Swiss-Prot record:
Its main location: cytoplasm. The lineage of its organism: Eukaryota, Metazoa, Chordata, Craniata, Vertebrata. Residues 59-107 are annotated as: Disordered. Residues 139-186 are annotated as: Important for interaction with piRNA. This is Testis-expressed protein 19.1. Required during spermatogenesis and placenta development, participating in the repression of retrotransposable elements and prevent their mobilization. Collaborates with the Piwi-interacting RNA (piRNA) pathway, which mediates the repression of transposable elements during meiosis by forming complexes composed of piRNAs and Piwi proteins. Interacts with Piwi proteins and directly binds piRNAs, a class of 24 to 30 nucleotide RNAs that are generated by a Dicer-independent mechanism and are primarily derived from transposons and other repeated sequence elements. Keywords: Cytoplasm, Differentiation, Meiosis, Spermatogenesis. Residues 73-91 have a biased composition (Basic and acidic residues). It comes from Rattus norvegicus (Rat). GO terms for cellular component: cytoplasm; nucleus.
Length: 356
């Protein structure tokens, strides 16, 4: 699997560098580095590449290769000289035997001018498209021929990477062999909340880090997480609320036996609540919830509570800025049902309703 370099994360509110960091967290070899340190290492690597830090090392390697290639043609040239001397002796013996003068002159011209000379009789016989045999040692001479160019080094224009890689720095090769873990605490406790110090927006993904409370089958757990209908409770007025659907992009198990779920924002809904006993309390803005079907209809349950029942404990809810706030979820209390919901706005595309 290739890193998410050519994917347009910017349209979803995520930079390519941030997507690469997420990829390393999920698929890397137990990398324990926060995004701030990951970005600092990337910028340092970019600085070294721009300053030509590895140019001297690369030039030394190229010089060694050139020396090897220069030695090989000289060996073949020495062998060819001995072959030419033998051929001259054979030509002298044929001349004494009384060969034709035209053939003798063509052979002398061939040997005098070199392998790149084509006799006139051969070119006339074979035509413009004929293949003319040349000595075997000439294939080594081709490597030593330098082809001039009309462009000067300062006139060279870098190739355009296209719209898929608008951030040109993402195409630079990583020269860092090892990313050492930073001193910031990742596990435990998970502290990714210092990455972004703003509240979630309609175009910003949410990353959940989950821990298993008991052993779970990997394929079953992954399928169950991908099938959940996550929503963000934006606000509530009386018995009406605004919900932001959060589509599950992927759910993977990390190298440290944790689960990561990336939620991508989708449509905004206007939902009408149904009161069961009395008005539910504790509905806070930006509360992550899950819609699940029940005997009484579609029920809105807190994500932390419902995930805990299925064996998952929420370790982090990115992007909060300090720690998991008390208002990010609420206790079940009274059951909260939704009678109907309609789409009021969308950022990317229209999707079909949660309800049949």
């Amino acid at each position: 699997m290739c890193p998410p370099v050519s994917v347009r994360h910017g349209a979803r509110g995520m930079s390519c560098l941030y997507g690469a960091w997420l990829y390393q967290l999920v698929h890397g070899e137990q990398m324990k580095m926060c995004f701030a340190c990951f970005k600092a290492a990337f910028l340092l690597n970019k600085f070294y590449l721009e300053m030509g830090y590895w140019e001297q090392e690369e030039l030394s390697e190229e010089e060694e290769e050139e020396e090897v290639w220069d030695a090989e043609p000289m060996e073949h040239l020495s062998e060819s000289e001995s072959l030419e001397s033998d051929s001259k002796q054979d030509a002298g013996s044929e001349q004494d035997a009384g060969s034709e003068p035209n053939t003798r002159s063509e052979q002398d011209a061939w040997q005098g001018v070199g392998s790149l000379y084509v006799p006139q009789s051969v070119s006339e016989y074979g035509g413009p498209g004929a293949l003319v045999p040349t000595p075997s040692w000439t294939q080594w001479v081709v490597f030593s021929i330098s082809v001039p160019t009309e462009l000067l080094p300062q006139e060279a224009v870098p190739l355009d990477l296209g719209p898929e890689d608008v951030e040109w720095t993402q195409a630079l090769p990583w020269r860092l062999d090892v990313l050492f873990p930073c001193s910031h605490r990742l596990i435990p406790p998970l502290s990714w909340w210092d990455i972004l110090d703003v509240m979630p927006s309609l175009g910003q993904p949410v990353l959940l880090e989950l821990r298993s409370l008991w052993p779970l089958d990997q394929s079953v757990a992954q399928t169950w997480l991908q099938d959940q209908k996550f929503v963000l409770l934006l606000d509530s007025i009386h018995f009406m609320c605004h919900l932001l659907s959060m589509h599950v992009c992927w759910a993977v198990r990390t190298q440290v036996q944790h689960w990561q779920v990336l939620l991508n924002p989708g449509e905004m809904w206007v939902a009408h609540l149904k009161r069961v006993l009395f008005r539910p309390r504790g509905l806070y803005p930006w509360s992550l919830s899950i819609l699940k079907s029940s005997d009484l209809g579609m029920e809105l349950v807190p994500a932390a509570f419902y995930l805990r029942k299925k064996g998952f404990w929420v370790g982090s809810f990115l992007p909060w800025n300090s720690s998991i706030p008390e208002t990010w979820s609420w206790d079940p209390g009274e059951r909260l049902f939704i009678t109907d919901a309609t789409i009021c706005a969308t950022n990317y595309h229209f999707a079909r309703s949660f309800f049949p």
